[in-house]
């Protein structure tokens, strides 16, 4: 079997040296992706296309599907490559190939020709089209909007009978641009923005700020691995996980409520910039869209950018949510994003939409930056190829209950402000308050002879914190969902 890879048009308008470099990189990317399917596969580059030849017919559909997901490819032609002698020979071979497809259909013939011949492309179109029209009684020629277009390519003494055309994702080959670090949360926005930078030729590494324990990290790892495996597996990339719970805890304890959102984002950019510098990455990528949430106004985005010299790319800045969700659906991350948890303890009640730099800096003076330095230093860096094995490991389960026993205590893990605004009162059981960001250091001080039922508004943070405590060896925790 043989496939002809057509280049993304923007590649073809580059200078000769740049075009050759892009084609060489794309050829290498194709080899890297396809070598797992067929070791005998050959990839040959030409000036205006790339040939892929393989012997294992059983892998035809798999190879074709993989090619449609490699950045830099405009479309793929599945062809049968045969020799020919003259125009009548071309017609006879086309008749054998297309007779069944044209039965009862309208059609036209389109020919591309390279090399020296005593006929033109139009001559072949007329001759083959006329012959097919005569020999297939139910077929009819229609030059505009036909049911079937018969595609032929003539190259020197070879005829390419095109059996199918399949669209690629376009863009530039990965590796033609410099590396970037995507701040991935597992939601709609960060997945789509990561894909867009891969499609533009960047090798995308991933940085995840963990706010909710192992279960949340496993979910985000699955999204990152899916994106890499589907669109970027030609290159090795990193997945860096930073435990940001201590940072969130410090913010919730010391920072004014209205400034929390912007300061949290500034801390994330600071941390990601340190990671990017450590690994020689040139830019950060976020899924922020203008005006989508309070921290994404122009004023707030400028203040967020101010904390780092690292370039921050926002490919979705002008996109609305519906467009982003549609893109997530197209690339296959929608289902991941819909099931990704939101956090009930990390959101300000009255966030500012127009932060003032002097106020932000004054609030940040209360923050202990040694905490930020420590979480970055302890960041977990893994090769994304190892994620499939790691995420396959069993996650500790935690029991969810809707009633309680005589030895149980409800543990309200919401932030202090939330608890003051809406105190939790349940008849027949004690309620103890301990904000989630203090659980890692204070839970051990509680009476370990009691069973603690963790509770929060949405039930997401309580489950994740219960999982975290179970992983730390505490067996006396459950999730309370009345």
Curated annotation (Swiss-Prot):
ATP binds at residues 183-184, 265, 287, 296. Keywords: ATP-binding, Cytoplasm, Disulfide bond, Nucleotide-binding, Redox-active center, RNA-binding, Thiamine biosynthesis, Transferase, tRNA-binding. Residues 404-482 form the Rhodanese domain. Pathway: Cofactor biosynthesis; thiamine diphosphate biosynthesis. Signal peptide: none annotated. GO terms for cellular component: cytosol. CDD domains: PPase_ThiI, RHOD, THUMP_ThiI. Its EC number is 2.8.1.4. One of its GO terms (molecular function) is tRNA-uracil-4 sulfurtransferase activity. It comes from the Bacteria. It is found in: Cytoplasm. SUPFAM superfamilies: Adenine nucleotide alpha hydrolases-like, Rhodanese/Cell cycle control phosphatase, THUMP domain-like. Residues 61-165 form the THUMP domain. It catalyses: [ThiI sulfur-carrier protein]-S-sulfanyl-L-cysteine + a uridine in tRNA + 2 reduced [2Fe-2S]-[ferredoxin] + ATP + H(+) = [ThiI sulfur-carrier protein]-L-cysteine + a 4-thiouridine in tRNA + 2 oxidized [2Fe-2S]-[ferredoxin] + AMP + diphosphate; [ThiS sulfur-carrier protein]-C-terminal Gly-Gly-AMP + S-sulfanyl-L-cysteinyl-[cysteine desulfurase] + AH2 = [ThiS sulfur-carrier protein]-C-terminal-Gly-aminoethanethioate + L-cysteinyl-[cysteine desulfurase] + A + AMP + 2 H(+). The active site is at 456 (cysteine persulfide intermediate). Gene3D superfamilies: 3.30.2130.30, HUPs (3.40.50.620), Rhodanese-like domain (3.40.250.10). InterPro entries: Rhodanese-like_dom, Rhodanese-like_dom_sf, Rossmann-like_a/b/a_fold, ThiI_AANH, ThiI_fer, ThiI_N, THII_Thiazole_biosynth_dom, THUMP_dom. Pfam families: ThiI, ThiI_fer, THUMP. Belongs to the ThiI family. Interacts with IscS. Catalyzes the ATP-dependent transfer of a sulfur to tRNA to produce 4-thiouridine in position 8 of tRNAs, which functions as a near-UV photosensor. Also catalyzes the transfer of sulfur to the sulfur carrier protein ThiS, forming ThiS-thiocarboxylate. This is a step in the synthesis of thiazole, in the thiamine biosynthesis pathway. The sulfur is donated as persulfide by IscS. This is tRNA sulfurtransferase. It comes from Escherichia coli O157:H7.
């Amino acid at each position: 079997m043989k496939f002809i890879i057509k280049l993304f048009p923007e590649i073809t308008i580059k200078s000769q040296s740049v075009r050759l470099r892009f084609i060489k990189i794309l050829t290498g990317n194709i080899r890297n992706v396809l070598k797992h399917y067929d070791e005998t596969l050959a990839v040959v580059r030409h000036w205006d296309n790339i040939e892929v030849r393989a012997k294992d017919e059983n892998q035809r559909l798999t190879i074709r599907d993989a090619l449609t997901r490699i950045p830099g490819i405009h479309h793929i032609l599945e062809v049968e490559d045969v020799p020919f002698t003259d125009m009548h020979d071309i017609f006879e071979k086309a008749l054998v190939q297309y007779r069944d497809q044209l039965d009862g259909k309208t059609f036209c013939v389109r020919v591309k020709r390279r090399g020296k011949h005593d006929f033109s492309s139009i001559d072949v179109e007329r001759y083959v089209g006329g012959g097919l029209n005569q020999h297939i009684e139910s077929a009819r020629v229609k030059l505009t909007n036909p049911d079937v277009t018969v595609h032929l390519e003539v190259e020197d003494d070879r005829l390419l009978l095109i059996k199918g055309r399949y669209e690629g994702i376009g863009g530039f080959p990965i590796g033609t641009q410099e590396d970037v670090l995507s701040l991935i949360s597992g939601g709609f926005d960060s997945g789509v923005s990561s894909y867009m930078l891969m499609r533009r030729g960047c090798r995308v590494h991933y940085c995840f700020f963990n706010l909710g324990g192992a279960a949340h990290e496993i979910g985000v790892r699955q999204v990152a691995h899916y994106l890499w495996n589907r669109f970027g597996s030609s290159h090795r990339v990193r997945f860096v996980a930073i435990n940001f719970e201590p940072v969130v805890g410090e913010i919730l304890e010391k920072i004014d409520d209205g400034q929390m959102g912007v300061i949290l984002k500034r801390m994330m950019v600071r941390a990601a910039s340190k990671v990017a510098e450590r690994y020689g990455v040139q830019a950060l990528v976020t899924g922020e869209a203008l005006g989508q949430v309070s921290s994404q106004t122009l004023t707030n985005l400028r203040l967020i950018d101010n904390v780092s010299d690292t370039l921050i790319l926002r490919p979705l800045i002008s996109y609305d949510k519906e467009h982003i969700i549609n893109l997530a659906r197209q690339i296959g991350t929608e289902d991941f994003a819909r099931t990704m948890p939101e956090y009930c303890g990390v959101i300000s009640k009255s966030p500012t939409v127009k932060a003032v730099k002097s106020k932000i800096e004054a609030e940040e003076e209360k923050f202990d930056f040694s905490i930020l330095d420590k979480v970055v230093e302890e960041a977990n860096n893994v090769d994304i190829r190892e994620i499939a094995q790691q995420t396959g490991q069993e996650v500790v389960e935690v029991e969810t209950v809707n009633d309680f026993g005589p030895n149980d205590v409800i543990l309200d893990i919401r932030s202090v402000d939330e608890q003051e605004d809406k105190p939790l009162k349940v008849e027949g059981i004690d309620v103890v308050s301990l904000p989630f960001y203090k659980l890692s250091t204070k839970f051990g001080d509680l009476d370990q002879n009691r069973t603690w039922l963790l509770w929060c508004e949405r039930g997401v943070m309580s489950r994740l914190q219960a999982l975290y405590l179970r992983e730390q060896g505490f067996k006396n925790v459950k999730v309370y969902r009345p």
